[in-house]
């Protein structure tokens, strides 16, 4: 199998273009759990016809699909972008035949074991993956009773939500200076998202990859906040938060926050305690000075100009 994978891998990466299956309801790669191996997979195709045949399999389940063309120079970025969402296998299809290749044969995850946790890029593959599975199912245009395993998917996502810490973008005011001091003195501005109906939300991000995808060239910095702190970070004029607005875009309103706090208090406490320990380690190590975080190991794929089918999803409008 290793030899077969070696030649198959070489065959895949030598192609000038691949078509990746994206889910229209999440603006992210379509994720699929293999019913036998239970590997979390993303599917790629040698041509458009192969993708269309695959998409047809899911049309009856009302799962919208679109093919995104990935140019050869963007392969590293694309496969690297699958690491933060917890994918373990890539399934390649050509001429009706499919084969699964472990993701780590395309791209290696950076070893951060010797880096203090507060300096590592924030990662949250469990939250990302369960969120994608949930939204693929929840946004199907079918009656709720026809949605497969919706309750269990929802519970698994909420547990991961309760355990998580998030990145919240801020704009630091007043020029140069210690960021922590500016935060304490209120010299920061929060980033808001204004909806077409007039509602205002604040973006939060599950990981550094999603934050950087949203940030692009803007001079945003990030506050790290556990789930337990979201309620206090939401003023009266804000309806809630949008998790990963450049990706699956999940609304987290006050009702959902209260539900999670009530149903999963132990998980919320674990997440808050873990965040406190990381922040305390940063204070003790830096002695009050703020050092630049390690950059995320991969960049978001840039499909503009490389897709003959559709463009990669953009960001939600931002004020």
Model-derived features with residue positions:
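An interfacial alpha-helical scaffold signature
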Residues: 1-319
């Amino acid at each position: 199998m290793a030899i077969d994978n070696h030649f198959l891998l070489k065959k895949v990466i030598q192609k000038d273009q691949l078509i990746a299956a994206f889910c229209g309801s999440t603006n992210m790669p379509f994720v699929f759990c293999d019913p036998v191996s239970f590997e979390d997979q993303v599917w790629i195709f040698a041509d458009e016809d192969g993708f269309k045949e695959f998409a047809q399999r899911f049309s009856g389940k009302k799962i919208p699909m679109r093919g995104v063309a990935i140019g050869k120079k963007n392969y590293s970025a694309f496969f690297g972008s699958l690491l933060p969402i917890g994918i373990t296998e890539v399934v390649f299809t050509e001429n009706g035949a499919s084969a699964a290749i472990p993701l780590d044969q395309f791209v290696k995850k950076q070893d951060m074991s010797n880096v203090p946790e507060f300096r590592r890029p924030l990662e949250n593959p469990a939250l990302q993956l369960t969120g994608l599975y949930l939204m693929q199912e929840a946004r199907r245009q079918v009656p709720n009773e026809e949605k497969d395993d919706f309750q269990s998917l929802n519970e698994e996502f909420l547990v991961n939500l309760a355990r998580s810490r998030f990145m919240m973008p801020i704009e630091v005011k007043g020029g140069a200076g210690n960021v922590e001091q500016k935060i304490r003195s209120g010299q920061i501005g929060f980033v808001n998202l204004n909806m077409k109906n007039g509602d205002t939300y604040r973006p939060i991000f599950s990981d550094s990859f999603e934050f950087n995808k949203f940030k692009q060239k803007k001079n945003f910095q990030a506050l790290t906040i556990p789930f337990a702190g979201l309620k206090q970070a939401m003023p009266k004029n804000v309806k809630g938060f949008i998790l990963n607005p450049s990706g699956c875009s999940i609304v987290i309103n006050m009702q959902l926050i209260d539900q999670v706090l009530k149903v999963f208090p132990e998980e919320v406490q674990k997440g808050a305690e873990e965040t406190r320990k990381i922040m305390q380690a940063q204070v003790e190590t830096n002695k009050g000075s703020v050092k630049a975080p390690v950059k995320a190991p991969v960049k978001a794929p840039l499909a503009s100009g490389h897709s003959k089918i559709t463009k990669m999803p953009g960001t939600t409008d931002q004020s």
